[in-house]
């Protein structure tokens, strides 16, 4: 159930160039699942007006804390980056349908593919898959080394490959270069990132079960404004879906790419 709460800042730190890790404390954490997101009001003033959708990177229900990782590049997220321990942040959430962690049986293997700021939600997903006895393989793509993050955290959960467009870290090129050269064996894949990457994955693994998390610009975050609609394929009855309320995670092949 979506609720609004003023959550307390536990910590905030910069972990890469313009990339921030923000941990908040509050009751909303108890309802969160991997792949969902929250809509954050970055300031108590009227400007910026719209909330910012940010994915959930880590969930700690024992301590009522969750972590977001975001890029501070626009006016709103730059304001959010000024928050310090003890301050409050107005959060609406959790929103959307997350990743189905039960899609992989115990003893199976999941391939997790992320690109840029689509990487964070895969961290909590990998944690929960590991807890169910599932092996995880991570292929994570970034533009350059200076914007890479969470290498130790992902490596602690499973086999991890980093890819950068300029070759400054890991394999040079795109995530598909690693998938071609390594040809990992797996049962189900999960992915979050830019549309070209998601489209490439669908073409790469036409026979595999997969789940894609979409990154779309959003206005309201609750399905009222229709700012984030995507056209569907003929696999489902709807002509269009809303990424915020119907997604952001969809089974492979249901959204037209």
UniProtKB/Swiss-Prot annotation:
Ranges annotated as spanning the membrane: none
Keyword Nucleus among record annotations: no
Keyword terms: 2Fe-2S, Electron transport, FAD, Flavoprotein, Iron, Iron-sulfur, Metal-binding, Pyrimidine biosynthesis, Transport
Residues binding [2Fe-2S] cluster: 220, 225, 228, 244
PROSITE patterns noted in UniProt: FAD_FR (PS51384)
Domain of life: Bacteria
GO molecular function: 2 iron, 2 sulfur cluster binding; electron transfer activity; flavin adenine dinucleotide binding; metal ion binding; oxidoreductase activity
Annotated FAD-binding FR-type domain residues: 2-101
Cofactor(s) for this UniProt protein: [2Fe-2S] cluster; FAD
Residues engaged in binding FAD: 52-55, 69-71, 76-77
Pathway(s) of this molecule: Pyrimidine metabolism; UMP biosynthesis via de novo pathway; orotate from (S)-dihydroorotate (NAD(+) route): step 1/1
GO BP: any one term: 'de novo' UMP biosynthetic process
Annotated cofactor note: Binds 1 [2Fe-2S] cluster per subunit. Binds 1 FAD per subunit.
The keyword Thylakoid appears for this protein: no
Subunit structure: Heterotetramer of 2 PyrK and 2 PyrD type B subunits.
Stored HAMAP family: DHODB_Fe_S_bind
General function of this protein: Responsible for channeling the electrons from the oxidation of dihydroorotate from the FMN redox center in the PyrD type B subunit to the ultimate electron acceptor NAD(+).
Family indicated by similarity: Belongs to the PyrK family.
Protein name: Dihydroorotate dehydrogenase B (NAD(+)), electron transfer subunit
Protein species of origin: Lysinibacillus sphaericus (strain C3-41)
Taxonomic classification: Bacteria, Bacillati, Bacillota, Bacilli, Bacillales
GN (gene name): pyrK
């Amino acid at each position: 159930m979506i609720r609004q709460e003023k959550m307390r800042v536990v910590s905030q730190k910069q972990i890469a160039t313009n990339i921030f890790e923000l941990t908040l404390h509050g009751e909303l954490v108890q309802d969160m699942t991997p792949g969902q997101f929250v809509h954050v009001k970055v300031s108590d003033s009227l400007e910026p007006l719209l909330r910012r959708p940010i994915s959930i990177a880590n969930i700690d229900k024992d301590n009522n804390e969750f972590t977001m990782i975001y890029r501070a590049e626009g006016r709103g997220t730059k304001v959010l980056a000024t928050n310090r321990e003890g301050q409050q942040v107005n959060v609406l959430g959790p929103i959307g349908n997350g990743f189905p962690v039960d899609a992989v049986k115990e003893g199976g293997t999941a391939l997790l593919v992320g690109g840029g700021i689509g990487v964070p939600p895969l961290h909590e997903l990998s944690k929960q898959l590991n807890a169910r006895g599932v092996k995880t393989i991570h292929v994570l793509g970034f533009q350059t080394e200076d914007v890479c993050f969470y290498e130790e955290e992902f490596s602690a959960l499973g086999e991890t490959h980093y890819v950068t467009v300029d070759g400054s870290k890991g394999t040079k090129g795109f995530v598909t270069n690693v998938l071609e050269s390594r040809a990992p064996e797996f049962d189900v894949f999960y992915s979050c990132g830019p549309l070209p990457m998601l489209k490439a994955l669908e073409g790469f693994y036409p026979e595999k079960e997969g789940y894609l998390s979409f990154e779309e610009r959003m206005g309201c975050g609750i399905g009222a404004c229709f700012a984030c609609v995507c056209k569907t394929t003929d696999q489902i009855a709807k002509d269009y879906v809303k990424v915020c309320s119907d997604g952001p995670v969809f089974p492979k092949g249901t959204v037209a790419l």
